[in-house]
Amino acid sequence: MKLIKKLLEDEEDSFFKNKIVFKNFVIKKVFKKYLQFINVTTGNNENSSVDLQSLCTQLINEFGHLELSVQKAQTISETCTDETLYYQQLSKQREIEIENEKKEIAILKETLDYEKKQRQYKEQYLALYKAINEKPSTEQTEKEIEKAQKELNEITDQTNKTTSKLELRTKQFQLLLHTLNELEKNLDESIPFIENSNNNNNNSNSDQSNTPMES
């Protein structure tokens, strides 16, 4: 969660900083073209019509570049925000699942301990019962022994089932932890990609500013 929060804050800071720098640069460039356009329209130069057409074309192109750059920046920002929110929601979901698994494992451990004690009591009772009835047992005694043996078998089966379920939940819990680790690893790998996308956008804007103007 801390990593996701930091990623979101860094992304917002980087976006707004780049947006301010880009906005100032583009506005200055467009304004410069606009001033040149105004100077030509108010001048008495014989070639003013040719210059006016050329500057008008350049000004339109600058506005086109501005619109395209803004669309690119907006698309990148929306994509990064959507991905960050997705990973944040996925991480919260995994944390909830892990907490639920922990609670279920704790309950299963308590159940297993209780059943082990019950089995121990039954075994002690059966051993004592057999010791008391060392002589040939009557029909009633045999029924009691058979009943106690049946209860012992049921407790043994239930204990085995609980043990198997506990092992399964433990494996599922370990899988959830592994999934969360993979999620954090993917986030770590996505940070350079986001920063690289922002750097590429800045480089593209810089290249446009260095392009010679048509005369």
Curated annotation (Swiss-Prot):
<keyword id="KW-0963">Cytoplasm</keyword>
<dbReference type="GO" id="GO:0016607">
    <property type="term" value="C:nuclear speck"/>
</dbReference>
<dbReference type="GO" id="GO:0005737">
    <property type="term" value="C:cytoplasm"/>
</dbReference>
<comment type="subunit">
    <text>Component of the THO subcomplex of the transcription/export (TREX) complex which seems to have a dynamic structure involving ATP-dependent remodeling.</text>
</comment>
<dbReference type="InterPro" id="IPR008501">
    <property type="entry name" value="THOC7/Mft1"/>
</dbReference>
<feature type="compositionally biased region" description="Low complexity">
    <location>
        <begin position="196"/>
        <end position="215"/>
    </location>
</feature>
<dbReference type="Pfam" id="PF05615">
    <property type="entry name" value="THOC7"/>
</dbReference>
<dbReference type="GO" id="GO:0006397">
    <property type="term" value="P:mRNA processing"/>
</dbReference>
<protein>
    <recommendedName>
        <fullName>THO complex subunit 7 homolog</fullName>
    </recommendedName>
</protein>
<comment type="similarity">
    <text>Belongs to the THOC7 family.</text>
</comment>
<feature type="region of interest" description="Disordered">
    <location>
        <begin position="193"/>
        <end position="215"/>
    </location>
</feature>
<keyword id="KW-0175">Coiled coil</keyword>
<dbReference type="GO" id="GO:0006406">
    <property type="term" value="P:mRNA export from nucleus"/>
</dbReference>
<keyword id="KW-0539">Nucleus</keyword>
<feature type="coiled-coil region">
    <location>
        <begin position="88"/>
        <end position="191"/>
    </location>
</feature>
<dbReference type="GO" id="GO:0000445">
    <property type="term" value="C:THO complex part of transcription export complex"/>
</dbReference>
<comment type="function">
    <text>May act as component of the THO subcomplex of the TREX complex which is thought to couple mRNA transcription, processing and nuclear export, and which specifically associates with spliced mRNA and not with unspliced pre-mRNA.</text>
</comment>
